[in-house]
Amino acid sequence: MANQLILLKKDFFTDEQQAVTVADRYPQDIFAEHTHEFCELVMVWRGNGLHVLNERPYRITRGDLFYIRAEDQHSYTSVNDLVLQNIIYCPERLKLNVNWQAMIPGFQGAQWHPHWRLGSMGMNQARQVINQLEHESNGRDPLANEMAELLFGQLVMTLKRHRYATDDLPATSRETLLDKLITALANSLECPFALDAFCQQEQCSERVLRQQFRAQTGMTINQYLRQVRICHAQYLLQHSPLMVSEISMQCGFEDSNYFSVVFTRETGMTPSQWRHLSNQSD
């Protein structure tokens, strides 16, 4: 930890009164593991990448939302046209009489669940507020900080209204096919996913859906599902006593030998090597 990279307030905030600002990542490059002197919300707009948060890997793409605390360690690797925005804030500088703990998971000791998703409607509403927030956070007039904090309050309420667990899209017809598809894929970690059956259920064109998915995420549907499963396998290898064959089954691979081949191709090491290396670093 002595050599841990720490992002400092003075490099992101204009003065000691500013509570909120926006850091664009157009695109997000590979970024080494780091912590912060501040907290942040991470909103992914497009592309894909590997986000490792407190040693847990997440394959991220459009609609992914993270609540990051100052002490959290995270990094970005294997990025592909990854476009995101960081809304960074200092909890101790917030002055509005808002129940921030109810709005922001992990805020000053509140229960923390870091990873959520936003559907297209929530993304559109959040983007509008973030654009206004970015404008105010770059402003120099006397009320800029107050306006930015008001907009931050609006943003966290908008996110709370529209966010949902990664595998639990609310039953509504207002979300897009891509939102429904990504949720269906998240629910297919342990079982085969049949795209033709999904398209039949949603009465949509399989070819068009494949094109839309690749345009928004930079991956094919099969690539995304495979990498989500491998991320889950990495987590289980590090944090569970399950045998490799059991993990293979829990990650949708009926053949453990095939699982090992895919895992090695994606990570550069066998499942056993990954587990050994992870245990050494703990």
Swiss-Prot record:
DNA-binding region extent: 196-217, 244-267
Domain spans labelled HTH araC/xylS-type: 179-277
Native organism taxonomy: Bacteria, Pseudomonadati, Pseudomonadota, Gammaproteobacteria, Enterobacterales
Purpose of the protein: Activates expression of the rhaSR operon in response to L-rhamnose.
Localization of this protein: Cytoplasm
Chief subcellular location: cytoplasm
Pfam family, one: HTH_18
Positions of the record's site feature: Interaction with sigma-70: E246
GO biological process terms, semicolon-separated: positive regulation of DNA-templated transcription; rhamnose metabolic process
Signal peptide: none
Entry keyword set: Activator, Cytoplasm, DNA-binding, Repeat, Rhamnose metabolism, Transcription, Transcription regulation
Protein name as catalogued: HTH-type transcriptional activator RhaR
Quaternary structure note: Binds DNA as a dimer.
Annotated Gene Ontology cellular component terms: cytoplasm
PANTHER family in alphabetical order: ARAC-FAMILY TRANSCRIPTIONAL REGULATOR, HTH-TYPE TRANSCRIPTIONAL ACTIVATOR RHAR
MF (Gene Ontology): DNA-binding transcription factor activity; sequence-specific DNA binding
Keyword Cytoplasm attached: yes
UniProt KW Manganese keyword: no
PROSITE patterns: HTH_ARAC_FAMILY_1 (PS00041), HTH_ARAC_FAMILY_2 (PS01124)
